[in-house]
Amino acid sequence: MPTRNIAIGGVQEEVYHPNALRAALAEFISTLIFVFAGSGSGIAFNKITDNGATTPSGLVAAALAHAFGLFVAVSVGANISGGHVNPAVTFGVLLGGNITLLRGILYWIAQLLGSVAACFLLSFATGGEPIPAFGLSAGVGSLNALVFEIVMTFGLVYTVYATAVDPKNGSLGTIAPIAIGFIVGANILAGGAFSGASMNPAVAFGPAVVSWTWTNHWVYWAGPLIGGGLAGIIYDFVFIDENAHEQLPTTDY
């Protein structure tokens, strides 16, 4: 099983080393960039429509903002931290044995803080406009949303593995960030009208903290972590040769 490759890592190397701190800072900045663009697009839509109902054009705009924002966020962080920008991606990569536990926890902290910082900056920059928190649409139950988040995040992390983690790929340059941005945009078009299509606990956490809205917040942790974990385990176990498996450098996924 892939979990055979999980390593805890040394505190000195994975927490206090300058390279680890640089990687954590890169995750903080990349997540801030992504959440600022994604949540900012939602605030802009509410401003333009005077908090009107979500429209098809609004959903498309949200999908594009998140796809473009994630493409940039992953690209600028890829050579430093791997550009995870998502605790679910970090969790999936951890279960596949491609990052140590301590480095994963460090990334999680950086990602969550980056999201919170982005939302506080948005609140200040917009003059106190409400920060839209993730929530379920009318008629959508928590279990329905949970399945949506599991499936969508599975697709996202599977894409990360196929384009960025799998050692058979070599260097794909900008193809991996583009593919990752595309799958997020496509999933928002599919699930945005139901669960909000978070696929990322950090993306849901920042708005929840700033708006102090926690209703069904567990869905946006459980779903992405289950989906991301399953994708990491399945891809690593089925498609990556065990004999060729090795811990990736900390500058990669």
Curated annotation (Swiss-Prot):
Interacts with cucumber mosaic virus (CMV) Protein 1a. Induction: By NaCl and abscisic acid (ABA) treatments. The gene is TIP1-2. The lineage of its organism: Eukaryota, Viridiplantae, Streptophyta, Embryophyta, Tracheophyta. CDD domains: MIP. Widely expressed. Predominantly expressed in roots. Belongs to the MIP/aquaporin (TC 1.A.8) family. TIP (TC 1.A.8.10) subfamily. Residues 1-24, 79-104, 166-173, 241-253 are cytoplasmic. The modification N-acetylmethionine is found at residue 1. Water channel required to facilitate the transport of water across cell membrane. May be involved in the osmoregulation in plants under high osmotic stress such as under a high salt condition. Transports urea in yeast cells in a pH-independent manner. Transports H(2)O(2) in yeast cells. It is found in: Vacuole membrane. Residues 46-57, 126-144, 195-219 are vacuolar. Its main location: membrane. One of its GO terms (biological process) is hydrogen peroxide transmembrane transport. A motif (NPA 2) lies at residues 200-202. GO terms for cellular component: chloroplast; columella; cytosol; endoplasmic reticulum; Golgi apparatus; plant-type vacuole; plasma membrane; vacuolar membrane. This is Aquaporin TIP1-2.
